A protein has these predicted regions:
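A polyanion-binding, active-site-adjacent surface
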Residues: 1-68
Length: 68
C-alpha cells in the first residue's frame, strides 16, 4: 500500500471531529499520485459530499472555467 492510499484509508476511518457525524462521504482526492500540481479545496460542498468526489459542484464548475 502506498503512503497516499494509507492516508486515504486513515481519512475514511476518521472520527476525530464532529464532521464525521454529518458527512455522507469522505471527499478525498483523485488523480495521479505523481502529478506535478495538486489543487486543494477549502471544504467539500453538498454535491461533493453526496458523490464523494472533489470539485463536482458549483465550485468545480468555476474551477473548470478558470483552468481553461
Amino acid at each position: 500500500m502506498t503512503e497516499w492510499e494509507a492516508l486515504r484509508q486513515e481519512c475514511l476511518r476518521c472520527h476525530a471531529c464532529t464532521l464525521a457525524e454529518t458527512r455522507t462521504n469522505v471527499v478525498f482526492g483523485v488523480g495521479r499520485e505523481d502529478a506535478e500540481i495538486m489543487i486543494i479545496g477549502e471544504a467539500p460542498g453538498a454535491e461533493e459530499d453526496r458523490q464523494g468526489l472533489p470539485f463536482v459542484g458549483p465550485s468545480g464548475h468555476l474551477l473548470d472555467l478558470m483552468l481553461k
